[in-house]
Amino acid sequence: MQLTENGAHLTYCTNIHPGESWLEVLTNLKQYLPALKSRFNTEYFGIGLRLSHQATIQLQAAEIAEFKAWLVEQGLYVFTLNGFPYGGFHNEVVKDKVYAPDWTTPERTNYTKNLAHILAELLPEGVKGSISTLPLSYKPWFNSSSNINQVFKQSTINLVEVVIFLVNLHQTRGKFIHIDLEPEPNGLIENSAEVIKFFENWLLPLGGKYLANKLNLSLNAAETLLREHIQICYDTCHFSVVYENPVQVFRDFKQAGISIGKIQISAAIKNKLPQEKSERANLAESLQKFAESTYLHQVVAAYADGTLQSYIDLPEALEDLKETTAQEWRTHFHIPIFNQTYGILQSTQDDILTVLNLLKSYPCEHLEIETYTFQVLPENLKTDLLTSIQREYDWVIQQDVENFNLYSSQFKKPLLKIP
């Protein structure tokens, strides 16, 4: 749904639905989207679409035309894509495979170009498009600074090749699309400082020169295009896990000239570590329910002196729980955003509220609810999927109406005109 006259859109990410082929994706969309839209008083309803590499290959001109006709018929529109997972994302062990192929590869580059081509076909006139993507690569894969520098270099070149493709799309089709790097724990870019360092050390100097040479531009013009077409996807769960202060992050990004193109509204698990061994046993029992085998659930521990310790996955962290002197753990597990507590565990919902409040001063056009873990939630947290998605929408809208007044009741108005 479009939330404001100036172009803010709210959706949920369809990566919550299993399905890698285009037929599976379309079947899910037809099952859930019209039913979900009917629960809201809105004429047009936005979609945050996740397409695997397989689906992008299958989604040819005829399929796109058929899909567009269905979207118009249903009052639906696509404005953002999730281009992070390339391959299978459900019903298999994903873990660190979600980072492959990474941004050093032609496969990732071509996949993202395919996504941009599809999104340009689907975008309504006058609506900007976004594609979120992985934070270049996965840090634990590399054991030397020289290896990492090579990854930064090749990733920069490949990102610029996509920017060239996007510039051409904008010039020839009138559709503006930006790629949004999505930092997360243990990603090659995992926090705001690393985002800024990547822009200042790699994207702007190396990428700017490469783009200027390719398009015969001045360095200033090339830098402007890079800043426009390479932005950041601020996932509230990810930034919370690494203990980032949203106020400081938004301020630092603005000062560095880095735009947040998309906000993924999601919550992580957080918990203070009790001193009593019996209480730690109870905590271990509660956390163990989230130590499932499909996705990585990175843990970041905070110590009294301010230092942080990162664990690759929750089972590894649980081995240290009895003896660790850390004061707090935060776990990368996207839990439903409408609850503040889960038994003795807490959520990082407060950071979502802070981010929503920041939108008054730092507008962002694309907001996407992203709780993709429904299938792997502990059984006691599972409810009817459609109802759960609706509750997340209701919570976001209610927070705005009660606290921020960014959108007032405008989400009810048919603001978007689809030809």
Regions found by a protein language model. Give the residues of each.
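N-terminal pre-domain/capping segments
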Residues: 1-121, 126, 226-229, 370, ...
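Acidic-and-aromatic substrate-binding clefts and catalytic sites of carbohydrate-active enzymes
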Residues: 18-26, 50-63, 139, 186-190, ...
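Flexible, acidic glycine-rich loops studded with aromatic residues
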Residues: 303-406
